[in-house]
Amino acid sequence: MDVFSEYLAGIADPFHRERTEEVLTWIKNKYPNLHTEIKWNQPMFTDHGTFIIGFSVSKKHLAVAPEKVTIAHVEDDIVKAGYDYTEQLIRIPWNGPVDYTLLEKMIEFNILDKADCSTFWRK
């Protein structure tokens, strides 16, 4: 998690920092083969050089960016979780629970779906 230390230290709100660290640590522990990176000032996880999932912090939520194909794949689960979303990101409100089952579903979908992907983003 050293890669994310500076990013986390820059999150002013202690609760937001703790929640973000909790999510990033959960992913790192659950998927130890994924690489941790900071790109575009966002913590993200990659696999063989291809993007798997990324995050950003805002005043009202933790934004999750798994790529739009993945959001379409899990759209029903996003609705069931009660999260607001666009075609590119999902908003997990700070005052609500993190649906780790949904995160797992998105990460596993991307790992499998992008197994043969040779680019950072899907084409």
From Swiss-Prot:
<keyword id="KW-0813">Transport</keyword>
<comment type="subunit">
    <text>Homodimer, upon Fe(2+) binding. Interacts with the SufS/SufU complex. Interacts with CpfC.</text>
</comment>
<dbReference type="GO" id="GO:0006826">
    <property type="term" value="P:iron ion transport"/>
</dbReference>
<dbReference type="GO" id="GO:0005737">
    <property type="term" value="C:cytoplasm"/>
</dbReference>
<comment type="function">
    <text>Plays an essential role in iron intracellular trafficking to iron cofactor biogenesis systems including iron-sulfur cluster (Fe-S) or heme assembly. Promotes the biosynthesis of iron-sulfur clusters by delivering Fe to the complex composed of the cysteine desulfurase SufS and the zinc-dependent sulfurtransferase SufU. Also plays a critical role in coproporphyrin-dependent heme b biogenesis and thus provides an essential function for the bacterial global metabolism.</text>
</comment>
<keyword id="KW-0479">Metal-binding</keyword>
<keyword id="KW-0963">Cytoplasm</keyword>
<protein>
    <recommendedName>
        <fullName>Intracellular iron chaperone frataxin</fullName>
    </recommendedName>
</protein>
<keyword id="KW-0410">Iron transport</keyword>
<keyword id="KW-0406">Ion transport</keyword>
<dbReference type="InterPro" id="IPR014922">
    <property type="entry name" value="YdhG-like"/>
</dbReference>
<keyword id="KW-0408">Iron</keyword>
<dbReference type="Pfam" id="PF08818">
    <property type="entry name" value="DUF1801"/>
</dbReference>
<dbReference type="GO" id="GO:0046872">
    <property type="term" value="F:metal ion binding"/>
</dbReference>
